[in-house]
């Protein structure tokens, strides 16, 4: 195997615009690169712009960046096709597409732009403005037809394709784009190989990576205006979507609009109507998603994707979820109302050496105990919650004892001298001291001890505000900022070692969880545990049976005409170059695919920067693949 030790050379300062870098830095998941080899590095989600369409110039559309997708697709409506060619002028839409496909096959013509242009097909379609609901009419020439294999029918699906410029991270690429309906997906745009090739790499561990240099720092509480109505904002790190207070919500599905009333703290109401983006299914029923115009200050208005609900019983009118936070902000966990200040940029905040954390961390205490950690907007003194603790005295001095699992998986009793005690409500928390590994730094910090809550089962750590001398900033774009991994280039296809087997796999930034081909799946129980036996095999003759504990199940939403799919999830050891991890893998029959495994975000997040078009960057291509 080739050596995996890429030190990425960057141009510029960390938090300036990506195009303006001039310093040389080593890049990690904690301090990421935004470009490499004069190509962008994109997160798994990015803002995409139709800047050549005047009505949509400067309007961001959410795009999913997927190295597993050969083509780029956009959501389009009212798609109609006509032709001025004498042989096809009486046909339209899907009939016209099939006639072109069949004619090209019969005449053995090449599948290229010149061939498709010769059929003189014009495509008319609309893209809906997400803020106004206006249908933007577009006409273009058919330049390609994508043939998509259907999982529910023997007959493939045909999608017309046009060439359009799309802009991400300040770079515009004229890409071949499929027109389709993507209303069932959270992202109206899917960015695939036709955009990424020779233009961008993908870092699956981040969302909105290209937006990070422009992020604003906001407080844990803010006040904004929506259509002249003051709304208080709080932050919810556990929720993906933001939600906003609204009453008298009425959805007009035919007009694709939502009418509702804003309501301030005094109960005064103001009517508003916005385009319906889509319906979101929540635990409390269906909720309409809209782009809410949010005025941050006198000079700046943003549009936040929120679902509408009654929040009259809550102290804030907007709950800010991870998606909107990642697109625009970094949160100061201890401050409030920072939007009123002149300069709230992330770039400026970094100068004071804050502790930057993510919603999900693992910290190491005293070099032997790895504990899940989470941010807090309330706790000042860092807090370790344990199953139980005991106070005692030794030589007249008070000490506290508690049990943690060490790096060898052994339960070990820890005893520390009590420095002081904190009274919080009815509980009294002893305060002790420990050595913490925070990224590449070791710090001796005080922390409090308390019992787990009733619903908690395992010890965890709460990252209080006093963990840093300046401030603790929350960056929701990624995870594990305190356990950084070096960035490395990886091909779309690489040879990985899975347990004792080595074979080529596909690196797919669009997949949340990795997946492996599994036959003869048999689930059973043993000693109270859910177990599974399955056979791995691929099309070059490798075959091996595995037995694993089932650690989870994945429920795949069925398409029309399909049965719901439930896949057992197991843990397997996977190695790519120097990256060696035990990850969760779902079991599915991938027999119809050449590549018997895909590595998704849960492996790639450890520093992989993936190409969509280059293969075998780290590893050698096997002879049987040549």
Locate predicted features:
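Pepsin/retropepsin-fold aspartyl endopeptidases
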Residues: 22-626
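Gram-negative bacterial Sec-dependent N-terminal signal peptides
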Residues: 1-21
């Amino acid at each position: 195997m080739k050596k995996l030790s890429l030190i990425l050379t960057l141009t510029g300062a960390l938090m300036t615009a990506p195009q303006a870098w001039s310093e040389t830095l080593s890049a990690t998941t904690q301090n990421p690169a935004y470009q490499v080899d004069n190509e962008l590095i994109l997160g798994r989600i990015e803002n995409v712009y139709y800047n050549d369409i005047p009505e949509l110039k400067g309007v961001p559309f959410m795009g999913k960046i997927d190295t597993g997708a050969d083509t780029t697709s956009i959501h389009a409506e009212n798609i109609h096709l006509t032709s001025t060619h004498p042989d096809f002028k009486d046909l339209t839409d899907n009939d016209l597409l099939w006639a072109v496909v069949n004619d090209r096959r019969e005449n053995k013509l090449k599948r290229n732009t010149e061939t498709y242009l010769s059929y003189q097909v014009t495509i008319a379609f609309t893209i809906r403005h997400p803020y106004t609901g206006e249908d933007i009419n577009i006409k273009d020439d058919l330049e390609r037809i994508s043939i998509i294999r259907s999982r529910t029918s023997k007959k493939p699906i045909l999608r017309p394709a046009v060439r359009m410029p799309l802009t991400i991270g300040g770079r515009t690429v004229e890409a071949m784009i499929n027109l389709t309906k993507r209303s069932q997906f959270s992202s109206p745009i899917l960015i695939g190989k036709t955009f990424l090739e020779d233009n961008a790499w993908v870092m699956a561990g981040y969302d909105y990576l290209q937006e990070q240099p422009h992020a604003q720092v906001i407080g844990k509480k803010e006040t904004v205006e929506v259509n002249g109505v003051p709304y208080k904002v709080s932050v919810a790190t556990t929720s993906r979507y933001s939600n906003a207070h609204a009453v008298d919500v009425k959805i007009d599905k035919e007009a694709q609009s939502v009418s509702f009333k804003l309501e301030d703290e005094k109960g005064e109401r103001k009517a508003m109507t916005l385009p319906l983006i889509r319906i979101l299914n929540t635990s409390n029923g269906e909720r309409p998603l809209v782009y809410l115009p949010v005025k941050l200050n006198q000079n700046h208005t943003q549009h936040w994707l929120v679902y509408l609900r009654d929040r009259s019983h809550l102290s804030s009118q907007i709950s800010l979820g991870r998606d909107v936070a990642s697109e625009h902000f970094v949160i100061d966990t201890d401050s409030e109302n920072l939007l009123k200040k002149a300069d709230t940029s992330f770039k400026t905040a970094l100068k004071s050496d804050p502790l930057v954390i993510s919603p999900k961390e693992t910290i190491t205490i005293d070099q032997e105990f790895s504990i899940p950690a989470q941010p807090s907007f309330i706790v000042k003194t860092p807090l370790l919650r344990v199953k139980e603790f005991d106070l005692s005295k030794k030589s007249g001095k008070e000490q506290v004892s508690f049990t943690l699992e060490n790096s060898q998986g052994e339960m070990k009793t820890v005893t520390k001298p009590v420095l002081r005690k904190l009274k919080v409500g009815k509980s009294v928390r002893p305060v002790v001291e420990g050595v913490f590994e925070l990224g590449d730094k070791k710090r001796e910090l005080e922390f409090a001890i308390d019992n787990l809550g009733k619903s908690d089962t395992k010890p965890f750590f709460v990252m209080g505000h006093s963990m840093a001398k300046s401030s603790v900033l929350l960056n929701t774009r990624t995870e594990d900022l305190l356990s950084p991994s070096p960035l490395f280039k990886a091909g779309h296809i690489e040879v990985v070692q899975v347990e004792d087997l080595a074979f080529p796999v596909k690196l797919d930034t669009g997949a949340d969880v990795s997946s492996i081909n599994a036959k003869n799946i048999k689930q059973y129980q043993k000693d109270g545990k859910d177990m599974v036996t399955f056979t791995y095999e691929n099309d070059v003759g490798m075959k091996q049976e595995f037995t694993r504990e089932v650690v989870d199940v994945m429920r795949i939403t069925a398409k029309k005409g399909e049965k719901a799919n439930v896949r057992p999830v197991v843990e397997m050891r996977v190695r790519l170059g120097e990256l060696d991890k035990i990850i969760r893998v779902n079991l599915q029959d991938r027999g119809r695919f050449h590549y018997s495994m895909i590595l998704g975000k849960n492996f790639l997040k450890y520093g992989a920067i993936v190409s969509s078009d280059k293969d075998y960057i780290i590893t050698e291509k096997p002879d049987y693949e040549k």
